[in-house]
């Protein structure tokens, strides 16, 4: 008879652990905890994690990374000034800061450059940054671009008569192209 009561008590205890303890309203289900980028752990959280609530099992806590750890895992940095147009916003950090990560494609294009496919286009040169692995960020090479358009880099376009300025080779040096006769 005593073994029957002990058996019932053990089974009841297991049932409480697996189905939630009555009176823990407001506690997270496992799915709710996961939706908050957390996990239900028994009593203690892993290092660098914080308790963000209770799970609906007795003695379990919903643990998640700190905002700084979450940001670092996404290769971002927490900044108080907010994200720029060339950043990807990964959400809030502590103290009103934002988790920002430079988007290499946006950054390359924002500065007037292009992303090459394996290599830069003929009239461009790589600038040492990558849009993504195997895709260099390429800057237009003024002299090569000028030459590809049939022009010449000259300090004074008046050396070619008649002439049009069709671009810039470098600071202060125009790309000059002779006008075609309209005969």
UniProtKB/Swiss-Prot annotation:
C(6)C(4)C(9)C(6)CC repeat spans: 27-64, 65-101, 102-139, 140-177
GO BP, sorted A to Z: defense response
Classification via Pfam families: Defensin_beta
The keyword S-adenosyl-L-methionine is assigned to this record: no
A single Gene Ontology CC term: extracellular region
Tissue expression profile of the protein: Expressed by the mandibular venom gland.
Chain segments annotated as transmembrane: none
Localization per Swiss-Prot or TrEMBL: Secreted
Primary localisation category: secreted
Keyword Signal in annotation: yes
Gene Ontology MF, one: toxin activity
Signal peptide: 1-26
Entries under SUPFAM superfamilies matching the protein: Defensin-like
UniProt KW keywords: Repeat, Secreted, Signal, Toxin
Family per similarity comment: Belongs to the beta-defensin family. Helofensin subfamily.
Function: Lethal toxin which possesses an inhibitory effect on direct electrical stimulation of the isolated hemi-diaphragm of mice. Neither hemorrhagic nor hemolytic activities are detected. Phospholipase A2 activity, proteolytic activity and arginine esterolytic activity are absent.
Name of the protein described by the UniProt record: Helofensin-2
């Amino acid at each position: 008879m005593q073994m029957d009561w002990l058996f019932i008590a053990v089974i009841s205890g297991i049932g409480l652990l697996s189905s939630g303890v009555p009176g823990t309203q407001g506690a997270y289900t496992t799915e709710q905890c996961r939706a908050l980028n957390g996990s239900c752990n028994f009593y203690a959280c892993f290092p660098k994690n914080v308790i963000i609530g209770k799970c609906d099992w007795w003695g379990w806590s919903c643990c998640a990374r700190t905002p700084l750890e979450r940001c670092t895992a996404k290769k971002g940095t927490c900044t108080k000034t907010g994200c720029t147009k060339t950043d990807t916003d990964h959400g809030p950090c502590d103290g009103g800061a934002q988790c920002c990560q430079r988007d290499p494609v946006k950054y390359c294009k924002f500065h007037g450059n292009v992303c090459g496919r394996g290599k830069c286009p003929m009239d461009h040169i790589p600038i040492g940054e990558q849009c993504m692995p195997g895709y260099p960020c390429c800057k237009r090479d003024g002299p090569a671009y000028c030459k590809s358009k049939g022009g010449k880099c000259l300090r004074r376009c008046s050396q070619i008569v008649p002439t049009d300025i069709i671009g810039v080779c470098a600071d202060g040096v125009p790309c000059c192209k002779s006008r075609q006769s309209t005969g």
